[in-house]
């Protein structure tokens, strides 16, 4: 019994140490967005992109189109309902909820070799029209599958509107090595 307790304690302390070593990077806002040269590489690629708009009004529930036998009116929108509740979890007051409304971007990408990679999100917002903004996160010695999250929320979203066009770049040594963009990006 003592052995099991000791093993459990060792596992918890090891996982705590490993979690402390890899803090989640936070995006920094760029004041000036400089154009970069393009040198696309097969060593870097975007795997998947998840976009979510969390607005003040929840999406309307619709009846499932798969089966007429279902009596649950929200069955087709279950994942959207979960995403909304996930993003609003812990927001008690109306002010807390207002700071969570906005655009959420999750980019899943892969690096086949170790490299210092910067993930940059360039975007335009509804009320700012052609004004280009950017946020970026840098990963040292990145290799394998990675996930980068960006959130245009709170006052940025409430004052400037929703994101209407975006592109995400993987940058190595000042060169664009992979790109993912929205349909409206020029």
What are these regions (language model features)?
Residues 116-124:
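Beta-strand-rich binding/interaction modules
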Residues 138-146:
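Short proline/glycine- and polar residue-rich coil/turn motifs
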Residues 149-164:
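Short, hydrophobic beta-strand segments
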Residues 127-135:
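Short beta-strand and strand-turn-strand segments in soluble, beta-rich domains
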Residues 162-176:
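Internal, hydrophobic beta-strand segments that form the core of beta-sheet-rich folds
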Residues 22-77, 112-115:
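A eukaryote-biased signal for short, well-structured alpha-helical docking elements
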Residues 176-186:
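Short beta-strand elements
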Residues 72-111, 147-152:
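Contiguous beta-strand segments within globular domains
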């Amino acid at each position: 019994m003592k052995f099991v307790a000791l093993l459990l304690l060792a596992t918890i302390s090891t996982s705590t140490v490993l979690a402390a070593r890899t803090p989640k990077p936070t995006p920094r806002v760029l004041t000036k967005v400089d154009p970069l040269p393009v040198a696309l590489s097969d060593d870097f690629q975007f795997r998947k992109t998840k976009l979510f708009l969390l607005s003040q009004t929840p999406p309307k529930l619709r009846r499932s189109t798969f089966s007429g036998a279902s009596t649950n009116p929200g069955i087709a929108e279950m994942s959207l309902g979960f995403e909304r509740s996930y993003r609003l979890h812990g927001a008690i007051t109306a002010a807390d909820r207002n700071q969570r409304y906005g655009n959420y971007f999750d980019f899943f990408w892969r690096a086949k070799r170790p490299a210092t990679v910067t993930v940059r999100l360039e975007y335009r917002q509804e009320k700012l029209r052609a004004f280009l903004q950017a946020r970026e996160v840098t990963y040292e010695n990145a290799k394998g599958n990675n996930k980068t999250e960006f959130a245009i929320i709170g006052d940025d979203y409430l004052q400037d509107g929703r994101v209407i066009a975006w592109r995400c770049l993987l940058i190595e040594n000042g060169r664009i090595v992979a790109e993912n963009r929205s349909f409206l990006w020029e």
